[in-house]
């Protein structure tokens, strides 16, 4: 069965989640028709947007154009109120090295150490984007989970 949708990511967890969501929403879609970027040799997309929305839409659009498949992409991170939305799009590399969750968390907590707990509100923000290969359809949605 040929791929129909490509996830603009090589994250196995995201692929599993996307397959579950889409095959439930679209019963005619088989799980193996949803593939990750590496499976179809999609190039890495530079995330140089200044918002979650811009990065997600860029990844979806470029991946769809490169593969000829419908593409889904996301960009997400933590937005701390007292830090005016930082670390934001830099969440995964806040401490310098991309993907070092412990270092990112340690640095963020150190930066907030003199802030009273009552003023440590934050949100997890996720932008999910969809694009068709011809560029005619592009859409992005934002989800936000607020905590304190």
Short names for language-model regions:
Residues 2-6, 12-35, 39-148:
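Anionic-ligand binding patches
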């Amino acid at each position: 069965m040929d791929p129909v949708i490509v996830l603009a990511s090589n994250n196995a967890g995201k692929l599993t989640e996307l397959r579950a969501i889409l095959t439930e929403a679209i019963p005619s879609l088989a799980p193996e028709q949803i593939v990750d970027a590496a499976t179809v040799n999609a190039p890495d997309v530079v995330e140089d947007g200044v918002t979650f929305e811009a990065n997600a839409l860029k990844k979806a659009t470029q991946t769809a154009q490169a593969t000829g498949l419908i593409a889904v992409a996301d960009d997400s991170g933590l937005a701390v109120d007292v830090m005016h939305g930082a670390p934001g799009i830099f969440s995964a590399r806040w401490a310098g090295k991309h993907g070092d969750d412990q270092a990112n968390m340690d640095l963020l907590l150190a930066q907030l150490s003199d802030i009273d707990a009552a003023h440590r509100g934050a949100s997890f923000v996720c932008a999910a984007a969809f694009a068709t290969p011809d560029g005619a359809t592009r859409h992005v949605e934002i989800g936000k989970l607020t905590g304190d």
